[in-house]
Amino acid sequence: MKLIYTEMSYSMTEILVNEARKAADQGYRVFYIAPNSLSFEKEREVLTLLPERGTFSIIVTRFVQMSRYFTVESSPSKQHLDDTTLAMIFYRALMQLKPEDLPSYGRLQNNSVFIEQLVELYKELKNAQLSVHDLTGLDHPQKQEDLIKIIELAETIMIQQDYNQDSPLQSFARAIKLGLLNNQLSKTVIVIDGFSRFSAEEDYLLSLLNNNCQEVIIGSYVSQKAYQKSFIKGNIYEASLHFLQDLAQKYHIKPVFATSNQVFKPAFSRLTQLFEATHDFSQVDWQLQKNDLDHFSLWQCHHQKEEIEHVAKSIRQKLYEGYRYKDILVLLGDMDAYQLQIGPIFDKFEIPYYLGKAEPMAAHPLVQFIESLERSQRYNWRREDILNMLKSGLFGCFDDSDIDRFEEYTQFADIKGFTKFSKPFTINSSRQYPLDFLNEMRQDIVLPLQELFKSQKQLGASLIDKLILFLEKIRLAENMQGLAQSQLEVEKNEEVWKRFTDILTSFHHIFGQEKLRLSDCLALIKTGMKSAQYRVVPATLDVVTIKSYDLVQPHSKPFVYAIGLTQSHFPKQIHHSGLLSDQERARINEIRNYRHFDIASAENSKKNHQTALSLFNAATKELVLSVPTVINETFDDLSPYLKELINFGLPLLDKGKNYLSYDNSDIGNYKALLSQIIAINRQDLIEMSDQDKMFWTVVLRYLRKQLRKQQLELPTSDYRLSTKPLSKEVIEVCFPKGIPLKLSATALTVFYNNQYNYFLKYVLNLNKTESIHPDSRIHGQYLHRVFERLMKDHTQEPFDNKLKQAIYHTNQESFFQQVYQDNAEAEYSLAILEDIVRSTAPILQLNQNIKVIDQEKNFHLDMGNEILVHGIIDRIDQLSDGSLGIVDYKSSANQFDIGTFYNGLSPQLVTYLAALKQIAPHDINQLFGAMYLHLQDPKLDLVTFKQIDNTLVESIYKALTYKGIFSEVEKEHLSTGAYQTKNALYSNDELETLLNYNKYLYLKAAKHIKKGHFLINPYTSDGKTVQGDQLKAITRFEADLDMAQARRLVTLPAKEKKECFLTLMRKESHL
C-alpha cells in the first residue's frame, strides 16, 4: 500500500492519475476508485488529465461497480435485493408473527415507518459486517430479542425466495478470500481518491485487496503543517489525518508528500492557511491581499428567490464572458428548501441544469393513480378518490371536459360510496345534465373497478394477475405513453414505469404463494411506489451542475456558487433516528474488530471542518458564498464559518432586491427580461432617474413591438381594481339589436348590488355549484308548492284536512322524495318545513274575505326601449270590493323599505304591481297592494309572558302578517285582515310615482348594461363598511383599500323619509 498526501494548492487527482499511468504503462490493470456521489465527475476529470484523453487500462469507477468486474461471471444467479423488496420481505415476516411474539415492537407490525427503519437497520448491519446477534448491550434486552426474531425470519424468507443476501462487496471479499481471483488481482493496481473514511465493509475489503493486489494507492489532502502536529483535535484536517494515521498504523507504512505540476491560485491557498491557523491555535502575521478578494464573494440576500435570481444573473454574465455552463457548479445548503425554487428560476433565465439528486416518485401521476386506487378500495368508493384517479390521466379514455362534467354531476347528486356509483344516475336539475352520456361513463368506470374490488382473500399471484388485467382494461400503459410532452418527460416516465414493474415483480415473487387481501396488496404496492426514487441523466454534458454542498470536492469547477449557507445548514448536524441510538451503536463498536457502525453524530465536527475546507477550495477561479436572511419563511443567522471569513477580511455584500437596471446581467436574456418587465408592470411605479426612465421606455417600446409580432400583450397595471368594457363584437352577440333585453327583479337587484356580479351571473352565466341536498332555494320551492295546492283546493273539506292533503301530496312528488328522503338530515329538514306550513297556514284561514284569483302567474312586462321584464307572481288576491293585490312568499323576513327601493335594491313588489296592472282585467282598475308573507314557525320567549292566555295567541298571529305596499284607498277593507299597514299606505299618486321610478331604474340599468362596461362597485350605506357582494375571490376587493369604488347609497333621516324619497323619485323619473 502507498499513502500519499498533498497541500490544497495542488491537485491530488493529477498526482494519482500519474501513479495510475505509471502502473498502466507497466501493463497493470488500474481501477481508479471514487466515492459514489463523485464517480461521474471524477471520471471526466481523470480522462481530461490523461494525455490521450482515454484508455482501456484505467477504469474510473466505484467500489461496488469494481466488484462486479471481478464477480460478474462467478456470482450466483439470485434475485437482487433493493429497498422496496426488503420492505416487502419484512412486511411478510411481520405478518407471520403475532403481537405477543414481539413485546417491544408488537404494536408497530403494520407501521410503514417501522418497516422502513428495519430496512435501514438491516442495510447498516451489512455495511458494518455485523449480524443481528451482535446487537448486544442494547438499552432493553427485549429489543434484541424482537429484532432477532424479525430479521432471522426475514432472512429465512430471502433464502426461500432465492434472494442474494450478500452485498456486491461481500461477494467480492468472499471470492478473494477463497483465492478465486488471485491471478487477476496480481495484475491489478487500485487507486483510491476522495475518501476520508471507509465503512467496515470497505475496510475489510481493502485489507484483502492489499494482500492480493499488486499495489493499493490512497491519496488525501493534508497540509505538511498539520501532518507534523501532535495534537490534531479541532484541526481542519482532522478527518484526513485520522484517516491516514489509521491506515499507516494498520499497514505499517509511512505516508509520503507529493506535489502536482498544476498549482491553483494563491488566493485559495492563503485563505486555507488562515482557516487552518484559526483552528490549530497558531498565528500568522499576514492577511489576504487585495487581489485575493477578486476570487471570493460573500453575498447576503433577503430570501431564497432573490438569492437564486442573483446567481442566475451572474451565470448569464459568465456566459457573456465566454465561459460554458459546464464550468459552473451550484451548491445548495438545504437541498429540500431550494429544490422546488431553483428549477423555475433557472428555466426563466434559460439556464440548463442537472440536479444531482434522485427524484422521489411521490408526485408522479402513476403514483397518484395507485394511491387513489388503494384509497377507493379502502374507503368504499369515496368520490374524491374516484375523481383523483380519473384526473391522473391514466384511467380509461376520457377527455378533461368529460371528467369535469362527471365531477360536476357527482357533486350535485352527492354520489359517493359503491351503492350510489353502481346505480344508474337518474336525478337531474335545471341544468339538464346529459344522463345518458354520464351513465355510459359511469359504467366504463365502475365495471373494471367492481371486478377488481370484489376479489376475496387469495394468493398474491392471483391478485397480481387480476390487477394486471384491470390495468389492461383501463389502458394504463397506453395512457402512460400519452402523458409525456417532451423527451425529458419520456425518459422520466420510462424510469417510473420500470420501477413500477419491478415492484409488481417483487410482490409476485415474495407474496405469490401467500394469501392476502386486496387492500393489503394495494397498500404494499402504494408504499413501494411512494418511497421509490428515480434519476434521469442529462441529455448534454454542457449544463450547470447542482448538488448538495457536502458532496463537493476541492477544485471541482472554475466557478462555484454555494447558496443557503445559514447557521442551521452550514455546518450540518447529523443525528441518527433509527431503531438504535448512537449510544447503543457506540457500545457495540467497542467490542468489535473490523466491524463497526458508522456514528455520524460522533464525527460531525471533523466532517464539517473537512466539508468547509473542500468548499472553500471548490473553485479554481471564483467562489461565491451566499446566505439568505430568511429561509423556509424562518429567519436564520450567518454560518460560523462565514463569520470566520469576514474576520479574514472578506467583505459581506448586501445584494438587496433585484432592481431593474441596464447592466448586462439584467438585460442580457430576453426571457428573463420579459418576466421582469411583467413584474414591474404589476407593481406601483418605483422612483427612477430621468436616464432610467428613458432607457426603460425604449426597452418597453421594443418589447411591445416584438410581442405584437407574436400576438401577445403585457398585462395592464392592476394596482387599482378596474374592468375593461366588452368589445363591440361581444356586445353584439350578448345584446343583439332588435331583441329586447330580458331583465327580472332579481337581476335588477344584483345589478345595483354590484355591477360586476351582474356580469358574472347574467352575461357569463356563471352559477354556483348545485346540490341535491335541500337548500334555501329548494325549501322555498317546497313551501310554495304546499301553499299552491292548499289555495287551489275549493272543496268543502275542513281547512286542517285540506292542509294535510296538500302536505301529503307535495311529499309524494318524485323530486321532493329524492331530496327529502335521501338521509336523516333531509328528513329532519322536511319535518321543520311541515311545522312552518302548519304554523303559517292559519293566516290563510283567517282571511275568508280574500279570493285567490291566480297562483304562480308568469308575466312579461314591456318597459319600452327593448326591455322585457319577466317573473312569476306567487299569488294574486282579490278583496271583496274587486281590487287586486299580489302576495310573494318568503322563507325569511322581508318588508318594503322605500330607501332600499330608491337605491335599486328592492324592486320586486313594485315590479309585480306594474305587471299586475298590465295583466289585470279591463274592468278592474284598483290595486290594493303588494306584500310579502313570511313563511315561519314563530318563536316566542315565554319568560316575557306572565301567564298562558289569549295574549300568547295574539303574539303568534301578530308575527304572521302581510307586510309590504298598500293602497290608502283600500284602507277600510284591509283593516279586517292580517295586513301590517302602519307606515305602509300610499295614495294612488304615490303608487304611480313608485311605478314610474321603478321603470326608470330598469331603463337606467339597461342603458348601462348595453354599453358592456361593468364596474366593481359593491354598495356601502355609511362609507365605512361594504354591504354589497364584494366577490373577493374573483375581484380581490378590499374594503379598506377600495372603498372609493363602492357605490354610496342615498340615505335620509327617518323623519319625513317617505316624502323626501318620493320627491327625489319624481325629479329623477321625469328627467
Curated annotation (Swiss-Prot):
GO terms for biological process: double-strand break repair via homologous recombination. One of its GO terms (molecular function) is double-stranded DNA binding. Disulfide bonds: none annotated. InterPro entries: ADDB_N (IPR049035), DNA_helicase_suRexB (IPR014141), P-loop_NTPase (IPR027417), PDDEXK-like_dom_sf (IPR011604), PDDEXK_AddAB-type (IPR038726), Restrct_endonuc-II-like (IPR011335). Keywords: ATP-binding, DNA damage, DNA repair, DNA-binding, Exonuclease, Helicase, Hydrolase, Nuclease, Nucleotide-binding. The keyword Zinc-finger does not apply. Its EC number is 3.1.-.-. Its cofactor is Mg(2+). SUPFAM superfamilies: P-loop containing nucleoside triphosphate hydrolases, Restriction endonuclease-like. It holds the Pfam family ADDB_N. Heterodimer of AddA and RexB. NCBIfam families: rexB_recomb. The heterodimer acts as both an ATP-dependent DNA helicase and an ATP-dependent, dual-direction single-stranded exonuclease. Recognizes the chi site generating a DNA molecule suitable for the initiation of homologous recombination. This subunit has 5' -> 3' nuclease activity but not helicase activity. Belongs to the helicase family. AddB/RexB type 2 subfamily. PANTHER family: RECBCD ENZYME SUBUNIT RECC (PTHR30591:SF1). Despite having helicase-like domains, this subunit does not have helicase activity. This is ATP-dependent helicase/deoxyribonuclease subunit B. The lineage of its organism: Bacteria, Bacillati, Bacillota, Bacilli, Lactobacillales. The gene is rexB.
